[in-house]
Design a protein with these regions (language model features):
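A glycine-centered loop/beta-turn motif at secondary-structure junctions
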Residues: 335-375
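Catalytic beta-strand/loop cores that center a nucleophilic Ser/Cys/Thr
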Residues: 299-341
Length: 376
C-alpha cells in the first residue's frame, strides 16, 4: 500500500507477467454474498477490492449472475479462498474466472486489518505483486499509480455501439406447474446511457415494462432526443464524475428537454453536476450491501447496496434540487429530485445485484413519471 504497509499472502487468479499483477485504489466491500456481481461491476474499474467476509468462492461462478461480460477490478483480496465449489448453478471457480481475465487475487490476508487501515487512513493506492523480494519497490509503484481523482474511466467501460436490451427477465427456478416467467408489456421507450451499466439495472428496467436502448457514454443529447424516448436513464460507472464533462453536458440538455430522467450512482453524480452542483471524493467510499438510507419523504429506512467513492456536495445543491435520501452512516447525499422537472436520482443501487431490494419502488416511480408525461 502507498503508506508503506505490506501484507503477504498466497496468489491466485492471474499469473504475474511482470513485476506487478494488479494496481489501483484499494477499497473494502462489506457484502457477505455476491462476490461475482462485485467482480463484474464496471464501477470497480481501477480498484482493488477487499472482501470483509471471511471465506469467498464457495459457490463458484455461473454465467447468469454476471453484471457485465467480464471482471473489471484491478485486483481481489480475500481472507480465505474456498478450496471447494459447492453450488448447483456453478460452472467454474473464482480462481478460474480471475485467471481467464488476467485479474490478480491474493488470499491469506488479514482483511480486518486492511479494512481498518483504509477506514482510518482513507483510500490508498496499492499493488498486488508476486515479486515478494522487493517490498520497497512495490510500495513505490503504488505511490506512482494514478489516483482516481480526475480520471475518466467511463470511456474504458462503456459500450462501443448502441444496442437494444432484450434479455429475458430471470426470476430464478420456478415449479413446472407455474409455467414460464411472464414478460410485462413494454410500455415505455427508455434510452439508457452506459457509463458502466450493470445488467441487473437493465433487467430491472425491462421487468418494469421498459423497452431499453443502450447508448455509449459520449452520445450527444441531440442523438438521444432524436430517438424520441419516453425517459432517459443515467447509469452507474467508475471514476471521477467531474472528469466526464461530455456526460454532464448531455444530461443538462436532456433535463432542459423536460424528459423524465432517473440516475443511479455515477448517473446521480453526473445529474448533480448538470444541475449546477459539485462533487467530492469520500474518505474511503461506500461499498457493500448493508448501508442504511433514510427516505426523507416517508421517514422510512432502506437497507441498500452501494458502490461509490465520490458524492454530491449537499451545500452545492441548495436551490437547485431537493434532498430526498440521506445516508444514516455519514449523512451524505443519497438521493435528490428536481423541484419542477420529472428528474430524480439516487446514489445507491436500488436494483441491488447483490443486496436487498428495499428500493425497487424507484423503478416504478420512474415508469410513473413517464406515464404521467404521456397523459399530458
Amino acid at each position: 500500500m502507498e503508506d508503506g504497509t505490506v501484507y503477504r499472502g498466497f496468489g491466485f487468479g492471474a499469473e504475474d507477467s511482470g513485476n506487478v499483477t494488479g494496481a489501483g485504489e484499494i477499497v473494502f466491500n462489506t457484502a457477505i454474498t455476491g462476490y461475482q456481481e462485485v467482480l463484474t461491476d464496471p464501477s470497480y474499474r481501477g480498484q482493488i477490492v477487499t472482501m470483509t467476509a471471511p471465506e469467498i468462492g464457495n459457490v463458484g461462478i455461473n454465467p447468469v449472475d454476471f453484471e457485465s461480460a467480464r471482471p473489471w477490478c484491478a485486483g481481489f483480496v480475500v481472507r480465505e479462498l474456498s478450496p471447494v465449489v459447492s453450488n448447483w448453478r456453478a460452472s467454474g471457480s473464482l480462481h478460474e474466472l480471475l485467471a481467464a481475465h488476467g485479474v490478480a487475487g491474493i488470499t491469506g490476508i488479514d482483511t480486518r486489518a486492511v479494512t481498518r487501515r483504509i477506514r482510518l487512513s482513507g483510500a490508498q493506492r496499492a499493488v498486488i505483486t508476486r515479486k515478494v523480494d522487493d517490498p520497497a519497490g512495490a510500495v513505490a509503484r503504488a505511490r506512482n499509480h494514478p489516483s482516481l481523482e480526475g480520471r475518466d474511466l467511463v470511456r474504458e467501460v462503456t459500450t462501443a455501439a448502441t444496442y437494444g436490451w432484450d434479455e429475458p427477465v430471470w426470476e430464478g427456478p420456478r415449479a413446472p406447474s407455474r409455467g414460464p416467467v411472464e414478460v410485462p408489456a413494454l410500455r415505455h421507450n427508455v434510452v439508457a446511457y452506459d457509463y458502466g451499466i450493470k445488467r441487473g439495472i437493465l433487467r430491472r428496467l425491462r421487468s418494469s415494462g421498459c423497452r431499453v436502448t443502450v447508448v455509449p457514454a459520449a452520445t450527444p443529447a441531440r442523438e438521444v432526443l432524436a430517438i424520441k424516448p419516453d425517459g432517459v436513464f443515467l447509469s452507474n460507472g467508475p471514476g471521477d464524475p467531474a472528469a466526464v464533462g461530455y456526460a454532464v453536458e448531455a444530461a443538462r440538455e436532456i433535463c432542459a428537454a423536460k424528459l423524465p430522467v432517473f440516475g443511479i450512482c455515477l448517473g446521480h453524480q453526473i445529474l448533480g453536476l448538470a444541475l449546477g452542483g459539485k462533487t467530492y471524493k469520500l474518505k474511503f467510499g461506500h461499498h457493500g450491501a448493508n448501508h442504511p438510507v433514510m427516505d426523507l419523504g416517508t421517514r422510512k429506512v432502506e437497507i441498500t447496496s452501494q458502490n461509490h467513492g465520490f458524492a454530491v456536495d449537499v451545500d452545492s445543491m441548495a436551490g437547485k434540487a431537493v434532498l430526498s435520501h440521506v445516508s444514516l452512516n455519514d449523512k451524505t447525499v443519497e438521493g435528490m429530485r428536481h423541484g419542477e422537472l420529472p428528474v430524480f436520482s439516487v446514489q445507491y443501487h436500488p436494483e441491488a445485484s447483490p443486496g436487498p431490494n428495499d428500493a425497487n419502488y424507484l423503478f416504478d416511480r420512474f415508469c410513473a413519471s413517464m406515464e404521467e408525461r404521456r397523459r399530458r
